[in-house]
A protein has these predicted regions:
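TM-adjacent membrane-interface loops and short helices in multi-pass inner/ER membrane proteins
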Residues: 74, 188, 309-350, 364-371
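Alpha-helical transmembrane segments of multi-pass inner-membrane proteins
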Residues: 2-20, 30, 34-43, 68, ...
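Helix-to-loop transition at the C-terminal end of transmembrane segments
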Residues: 24-28, 75-86, 158-169, 287-297, ...
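Peri-membrane helix termini and adjoining interfacial loops of integral membrane proteins
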Residues: 85-103, 165-177, 291, 337-345
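Short, intrinsically disordered terminal tails adjacent to the first/last structured region
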Residues: 1, 316, 437-454
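Short aromatic-rich membrane-water interface segments that cap or initiate transmembrane helices
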Residues: 89-119, 177-193, 304-307, 352-360
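N-terminal hydrophobic segments of proteins, predominantly signal-anchor/transmembrane helices
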Residues: 8-23, 43-124
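Flexible juxtamembrane loops connecting transmembrane helices in multi-pass membrane enzymes
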Residues: 181-182, 250, 254, 282-320
Length: 454
């Protein structure tokens, strides 16, 4: 019984994150998820079972430890002679001068309280990694949690579109949201689109599992019909959602996911499909780099800038101002407002760079850039291993597609800033590491090379 409970922790917690962690506006919901994350991590720490970590898990642990060290250094008090020499601190010194105060010891982060809040938001993804890798779980259960939450989100989205397009609607969970379109359990329609996209490879993985359970043609056809129905539901969700992110990434994600079911034998076919996915991803990034379309963002969501290029230019200016030292974790919105042109200021404000890589570079400086490159190298090597080795199953491959879609989307948005997508990303990474085929012997890991005569 205890083993079943332990294996249910990851899918149940993932489901909770997907339902409750759709926005930072949900203060109490996020606090509950963070406290639960601490409990999961503590459980894993006292679990007496001896489980050897796979090499990829050990590597990811090292990267995570480096990230934790970098975050901790943000809050270490520095003497005035040191922190005043860092780029971008002249504005802080001016503030001390206006108040007639002598500068004292201060941390590297310009907004340490925001940094602590951002660090606490990392607890759900860490707990998800620990739950899958240390406590263990069944891969299909995780996939079912993703697909189930997505189906519920689409149905909720249909009610949102059919109802009042304002905060007065009972179907929108957050006061500030993209009203008039399907946001599901999220405040941002782009983050709902991320969930819809990530659900596609997990639907395909479940379909591949169901089709291999039996040789009965009718049962296989029924399984494929269920898969087709689930994919149709996701397509409806994308239409109701109206996000450019969903439209731009749908084709490459769908093509890559199709390989989990069809599994073409020819290397040329597989390479062509992967090339199509790559081209689609590039087109997606190029599309979202164009000026914002008011039809998609809506007048209520308009920011004080008119295009992503202008936002990127302002973010680059922030990088130039704070240089290799960084401004501190969670400080982007405050830093941007310090440097924003008065002519562009109105009743709305920029809260994120809509490019998580650039935002982290501004906040964490050169060490953050190096850490991101190290993680991306790890992800690429792990994805390559999953694609080349027959030891990994369709859920590990679905994890590659899902995490890849999130990484691409993060170049033009900030989906990982929510507990929901953060936990989903962590679950995908964990599947890339531990989800393997069940085999009876080494011979099952490679194609049979001899003729069997019955």
């Amino acid at each position: 019984m205890s083993g079943r409970i332990r294996k249910a922790v990851a899918p149940v917690y993932l489901l909770l994150c997907l339902v409750l962690g759709g926005s930072a506006q949900g203060i109490w919901a996020n606090a509950f998820l963070q406290v639960t994350a601490i409990a999961i991590i503590a459980w894993a720490a006292v679990d007496g079972r001896e489980i050897g970590l796979p090499p990829r898990a050990r590597q990811l642990t090292i990267i995570g430890a480096l990230g934790l060290l970098l975050v901790a250094l943000q809050f270490v008090p520095l003497p005035p002679a040191l922190w005043t020499a860092l780029p971008g601190r002249s504005l802080v010194l001016e503030g001390f001068a206006i108040l007639g105060l002598e500068p004292g010891w201060m941390p590297l982060s310009l907004t340490p309280y925001d940094g602590l809040a951002t660090a606490a938001a990392l607890l759900p993804p860490v707990a998800m990694l620990v739950a899958v890798i240390k406590l263990g779980c069944r891969s299909p259960w995780l996939a079912l949690a993703v697909v189930g939450a997505t189906a519920a989100a689409v149905m909720l989205g249909a009610l949102q579109v059919a109802g009042v397009a304002s905060a007065e609607s009972p179907w929108y969970f957050y006061e500030r949201s993209n009203f008039g379109v399907a946001t599901g359990f999220f405040a941002n329609s782009n983050h709902m689109a991320t969930l819809l996209l990530v659900a596609i490879p997990f639907v395909a993985a479940l379909g591949a599992t169901a089709s291999r359970w039996t040789d009965d043609a009718r049962k296989r056809a029924a399984a494929m019909a269920i898969v087709a129905g689930a994919l149709l539901l996701i397509a409806v969700g994308l239409a109701l959602n109206g996000s450019l992110a969903g439209y731009g990434l749908a084709l490459p994600v769908a093509v890559a996911s199709l390989l989990l079911i069809v599994r073409p034998r020819g290397a040329v076919v597989r390479s062509a499909a992967l090339a199509l996915g790559f081209v689609g991803a590039v087109m997606f990034v190029q599309l979202l780099a164009s000026p914002l379309n008011e039809r998609f963002v809506g007048a209520g969501a308009a920011t004080s800038i008119s295009s992503r290029q202008a936002l990127t230019a302002g973010s680059v200016q922030a990088w130039e101002a704070f240089g290799p030292g960084g401004s501190g974790l969670g400080s982007y919105s405050e830093v941007y407002r310090l440097l924003e042109s008065p002519s562009q200021v109105n009743t709305t404000f920029v809260n994120h760079a809509h490019n998580d890589y650039l935002e982290l570079a501004i906040e964490l400086g050169l060490p953050g850039i190096l850490l991101m490159l190290l993680f991306l190298a790890w992800w690429g090597a792990t994805a390559w291993q999953v694609g080349r080795s027959q030891a990994f199953d369709q859920y590990a491959q679905a994890g590659v597609i899902a995490s890849g879609a999130i990484l691409v989307h993060s170049a033009v948005d900030f989906p990982l800033r929510t507990a929901a997508i953060g936990a989903l990303f962590a679950a995908s990474l964990a599947l890339m590491i531990v989800s393997k085929r069940r085999v009876d012997g080494k011979a099952d890991l490679r194609p049979t090379r001899h003729l069997v005569i019955h």
